[in-house]
Amino acid sequence: MKRHLYGLLMACMSLFLLCASAFANEPKTAGKHGIKVLILCTGNTCRSQMAHGLLASYGKDVVVYSGGVRAEKRVNPKAVMVMREREIDISDHIPCKVDEYLNEDWDYVITVCDHAKETCPVFHGNVKHQIHMGYEDPSKATGSYEHVLNEFRRIRDDIDRDFFQLYCEMEERK
């Protein structure tokens, strides 16, 4: 009897987690005063996820999503690590394909790598501002573990600087 209940409990928890993760990626409207932003990259594992976490941390009036033209399976662990250094947790983010967002309306669609800019699909919804902010891919860095981690930090800091400036401009336009 205990095994049966345990099995049933585990099945229910698995279903709950599956539904919760699907709901977490579901686009919502930003409302009258919110700014709805989509950040795109190739795999949606490093740059776009760091930008997503940073931009969302600046204020509650920005609704942020991220996607990839070829989304990978999970967020890069080094990206998660360097974001934790800033007390931003992106460990529960799930890479998504940009196709999930093509019919949505967006205030901003931002590409953070050249490949995403070149292969960005046509959005069927209204896109008010399309911006490209290209960054090197820190996952391509080679060398010692510390050197690679420092590359992730450098890209994180570059994204932070540029996206905070963009956030301030967004606030002025509201």
Predicted regions and their residues:
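Bacterial N-terminal signal peptides that target proteins for export
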Residues: 1-9
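Conserved active-site segments centered on acidic
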Residues: 24-100
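Phosphate-binding/catalytic loops
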Residues: 27-29, 120-174
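Short glycine-rich anion-binding loops that position phosphate/pyrophosphate groups of nucleotides
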Residues: 45, 114-117
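Short glycine-/acidic-enriched loop or helix-start segments at secondary-structure transitions
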Residues: 49-51, 76, 119-122, 142
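Alpha-helix C-terminal capping/helix-to-coil transition sites in glycosyltransferase folds
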Residues: 103-105
